[in-house]
Amino acid sequence: MNAPIPHAVCHLNDMPLANSFASLPPAHYTALMPTPLPAPYLVCASASAAALIGLDFSDIDSAAFIETFTGNRIPDGSRPLSAVYSGHQFGVWAGQLGDGRAILLGDVPAPTMIPSGRLELQLKGAGLTPYSRMGDGRAVLRSSIREFLCSEAMAALGIPTTRALCVTGSDQIVLREQRETAAVATRMAQSFVRFGSFEHWFYNEKHDELKTLADYVIAQFYPQFKTAENPYKALLTEVTLRTAQMIAHWQAVGFMHGVMNTDNMSILGLTLDYGPFGFMEAFNATHICNHTDQQGRYSYARQPQIGEWNCYALGQTLLPLIGDVDETQNALRIYKPAYAEKFAELMRAKLGLQTQQPDDGKLFDALFAVLQGSHADFTLFFRRLGELRIGQAASREALRDLFLDRAAFDDWALQYELRLQLENSDDDARKLAMHAVNPKYVLRNYLAQIAIEKAQNKDFSEVAKLLQVLEKPFDEQPENEKYAALPPDWANDLEVSCSS
C-alpha cells in the first residue's frame, strides 16, 4: 500500500487539538477526565500511524508523550468525552452500552484522511465512564498489544481499519480471568461512530437526536450526500457498500473478527474493536476464533451473512429518516452483489487471474472445498501458489505438502492450470502479481502470544520486531522467515475471548 503523504511535522505540545464530536448535543456523550495510571511506561508505538497526524516520532520517549497517551496529562484543546451507544450483541438486543473504557481526547489534522482531514485520538483503557456497567474501565496489556499489532497489520494489508498510535502500560493490577496489568491503547480513526450509535436513538424513540447524529455524520464524513435527493438513503447505501467490501477483504485474507456485534460496526466501514480476532491457519470454514461464541454466530463462513444482518439493523434505525420502506430496502440490496463482486475481484487477484471467466466462481468454490478437506494452512497456501509453473509438476510439491488429500489438490491444480492458460501472462509476472496481494506474514495468534509474554516481563523488543515484520506483509524478508512458519503444536491450545 502507498506510504502516507507526509505533512508538516509537529511536536506533541504544538499539536492543534479540537473535538468535533463535542459539537453534538450533550445527550450523545459524557464529558469526563481519564483516570490516571501510576508510573506509566511506553510499550510500543507506530511510526506510520504517527506520520498520519504529522507527529514527531522522536517525541515518543518523552514524559509528555507517555503521560498524554496514558490519560495522565490532558493536552491543550482537548475536551475528553465518552460516547453513548447501544447495540445487538450476538443477535440479541443489549440496550445501552457506550464507551465503557474509551475516552476520546479529540481530533487532530491528518491531511490524507478524506474528507474530514482529521483523525480522532481515543484512549482505550483510560478509566471508568458512565457506560462502564460492571467493568472497571481498564484494558490489560495482553489485549492492548493484540489490538495495536492487528490494527497496524491490517493497515499494511490494505484493509480498512482503525489505526493504533501506541500502547502505554502500568504495573497496576487488573483482575480478569487472572491477575494482569493495566495498559492504554491509543486508537485513531476519522470517527468511532458505530451502527449502535444510531440504534441507541432509534430504540429510545428519540428521532430528533437520530437526525442530529445522521446530519453530523453526513456533514463530517459524507459531505457529498448533503445535496442528494435523499441524503439518508445515500448514507445507508454507502455504509452498506463499504461494509460489504470490508468483509470481502476479511474473507480474502482469512481474518476473523470474533465479535461482530452492531456496536462494533463502524459507520465508515472500518475494522473496529479488535478483541478475540484471529487469522485463519488450518482452513476450516466454520472456525470460531472467539471461544465464548458457543453457537458459532461469528464463524469465518458466517461473517458475510452477519455483515448483511448488521446493515439491516442499521437500515431499521434510518427508516424514520429515509421515510420509505422500499427505499430503505433498495439501499440494503446492494450488499450481496457488492460483496460478491469485491470477493471475486480479490480472489482473482489472489489466483493471479487478470480476466473474468464464467466459471471462476466454480474454481473458487472447488478450491475452498479442497482447503477444507485437508485443513491446509490458508496463508501459506496462497503465498506458495505463486510459485506454481504451468506444466511443471515439480513446482507443485511445496503446495502438495500442505494437503492430506493430495489427489484432491492435484485435481484442483489441473483445473487451475487450464484456467491460467486463458490468461496472457507468464509465470514470473504472475508470481510478482500474486505475491503483491497474498501476504507472507500475518498476525498469527502464537506470534502475538510470544510477544505478549515477553512484554509481561518488561521486554518489549518482540512487540517492536513483530510490528516491523507485519508492516511489510508482502515482502519476502528472508531474515524473518520464522515469522511465516506454521504454528507450533502448543499453539493449538491457545484460546482468545472477549476478556480484555
From Swiss-Prot:
Family classification: Belongs to the SELO family.
Fetch the Pfam families from UniProt.
Answer: SelO (PF02696)
Catalytic reaction list: L-seryl-[protein] + ATP = 3-O-(5'-adenylyl)-L-seryl-[protein] + diphosphate; L-threonyl-[protein] + ATP = 3-O-(5'-adenylyl)-L-threonyl-[protein] + diphosphate; L-tyrosyl-[protein] + ATP = O-(5'-adenylyl)-L-tyrosyl-[protein] + diphosphate; L-histidyl-[protein] + UTP = N(tele)-(5'-uridylyl)-L-histidyl-[protein] + diphosphate
Quote the protein name from its UniProt record.
Protein nucleotidyltransferase YdiU
Q: Which UniProt keywords apply?
A: ATP-binding, Magnesium, Manganese, Metal-binding, Nucleotide-binding, Nucleotidyltransferase, Transferase
Cofactor(s) in the UniProt record:
Mg(2+); Mn(2+)
What is the stated purpose of this protein? Nucleotidyltransferase involved in the post-translational modification of proteins. It can catalyze the addition of adenosine monophosphate (AMP) or uridine monophosphate (UMP) to a protein, resulting in modifications known as AMPylation and UMPylation.
Which amino acid positions bind Mg(2+), per UniProt? N264, D273
Q: Which GO terms describe its molecular function?
A: AMPylase activity; ATP binding; magnesium ion binding
Annotated source species: Herminiimonas arsenicoxydans
Which residues act catalytically here?
D263 (proton acceptor)
| Gene behind this protein | ydiU
EC class: transferase
Q: Which residues bind ATP?
A: G98, G100, R101, K124, D136, G137, R187, R194, D273
Database matches in InterPro entries = SelO (IPR003846)
EC number(s) given by UniProt: 2.7.7.-, 2.7.7.108
